[in-house]
């Protein structure tokens, strides 16, 4: 939220983030990019303070792919003066969804879902009505829950095209998958679970947030993974 708050109010103060079971969550990408947009960044007693009278667009090349870094700076840049170009950005569907949402409010964002996002700053944003797409990680979790219990599940109002990396691994595990434009059915009844090797990677690779669920599935498989 740091980028959107400093862009709108000129000042933001938030606690330094912690982490999760995977590890700590560094925020260097976020802070370095905000400084390039003109924000003054200070670390005080476990808090990050960012301030700026007016952010100014620039070109930013992320040193590594970061979903939250891309989203944070995209939200900051929509209210910055002039054009901002973000390179080496995350291409996750959620980044595209955020761009669509911001554009529905009056932002001018193009290129979301590619390696480069271009943002033309606007003076302000307006309210809008927006339907949030289904969560592919949540859907994948339900699919694996059915797989480990040798069940049958149908998930509706989902976009299977966003989940090819997950569905391909489920097929390799022995699940039968039937997918249409907005529905996925998994059948694992009376089947043996096969081991599947997993390597996580930025989209369109296999999502990190699905590795724990697949660990459970692989733990019940016949073989090594």
Predicted regions: what they are:
Residues 1-225:
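Short, structured segments at the rim of ligand-binding sites
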């Amino acid at each position: 939220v740091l980028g959107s708050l400093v862009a709108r109010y000129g000042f933001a103060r938030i606690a330094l983030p912690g982490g999760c079971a995977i590890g700590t969550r560094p925020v260097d990408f976020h802070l370095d990019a905000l400084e390039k947009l003109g924000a003054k960044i200070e670390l005080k007693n476990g808090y990050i303070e960012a301030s700026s009278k007016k952010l100014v667009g620039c070109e930013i090349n992320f040193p590594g792919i970061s979903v939250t870094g891309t989203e944070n700076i995209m939200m900051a840049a929509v209210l910055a003066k002039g054009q901002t170009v973000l390179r080496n950005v995350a291409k996750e569907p959620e980044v595209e969804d955020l761009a669509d949402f911001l554009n529905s409010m009056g932002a001018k964002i193009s290129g979301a879902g590619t390696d480069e996002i271009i943002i033309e700053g606007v003076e302000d944003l307006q309210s809008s009505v927006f339907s949030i797409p289904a969560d592919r990680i949540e859907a994948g979790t339900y699919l694996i829950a059915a797989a480990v219990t040798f069940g049958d599940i149908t998930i509706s109002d989902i976009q299977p095209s966003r989940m090819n990396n997950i569905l391909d691994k489920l097929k390799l595990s022995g699940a039968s998958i039937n997918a249409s434009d907005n529905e996925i059915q998994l059948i694992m009844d009376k089947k043996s679970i096969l081991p599947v090797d997993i390597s996580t990677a930025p989209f369109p690779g296999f999502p990190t947030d699905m590795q724990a669920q697949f660990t459970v599935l692989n733990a019940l498989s016949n073989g090594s993974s």
